[in-house]
Amino acid sequence: VGAALVCEDGSIYEGCNIENASFGLTNCAERTAIFKAVSEGHTKFKALAVVADTEGPCAPCGACRQVMGEFNIPIIIMGNLKGDIEVVSTEALLPFSFSSTDVIDK
């Protein structure tokens, strides 16, 4: 799986899956790209593309959808190696998402 994140200033950060024998510690391509960009000071994004050798367009996992929502990435482009493409919003991928507005300030 590969991902590319377009920042508001036009810079692009790429990501790949980082596998681990303990599957829970594996990091997906989408989050790798997002975390690389954030670690370099970017917090505003235009779009994220994700592609894999899958039957249909590669859909992000739930954890990636949550992170995309946290960073307000408006456009998600999902594809595969055959050229199938779906373009959706993060909101469409994660309706009724949990966000910082759901955290009660104590």
Residue positions per predicted region:
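Phosphate/diphosphate-binding glycine-rich loops and adjacent basic-rich segments that engage nucleotide
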Residues: K106
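Unusually extended, aromatic-enriched hydrophobic runs near protein termini
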Residues: V1, D102-V103
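Zn2+-dependent cytidine deaminase-like catalytic core
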Residues: E14-D102
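Short beta-strand scaffold segments in enzyme catalytic cores
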Residues: V1-C7
